[in-house]
Amino acid sequence: AEVAMKGNWVISSVSYPGSDYIKVSSFEIADSQCFVGSTWKFVSNNNKGEMALTKTGCPAFSSPLTWYVNKEGNFVMKVLDAGEKAKRVREGYVLKVANQTENSFQLVDRITVGNSMADVVYQFQKTN
């Protein structure tokens, strides 16, 4: 799974299957919809990468990151410049990988909304 993720990607959509829009701060950085249009680069041989938010009206944010696919097949990511407030920088975020093809894949974050669980689906499209 890791080799297929190397390269440059853009998040083409962020959706909430089975739910309406959910106000969620993705990775303690910005509202999930601010990630639409964001650019991501994954380097597979050293498990490093970088990401940048590009959407107008959203915080300007870019950061190096580290990532790998664990033995359960989940994507583990740490956004290194998310600052002290992002206490999960140390252990990272674990997201499910879904619908992986040569040119696209999804990362699915399971979040708690009130008393129930919801999915946030980040749709990645290859840009080169």
Language-model features, listed with the residues they occupy:
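Lipid interaction determinants
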Residues: A1-S63, K71-N128
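Extra-cytoplasmic beta-strand recognition segments
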Residues: W67
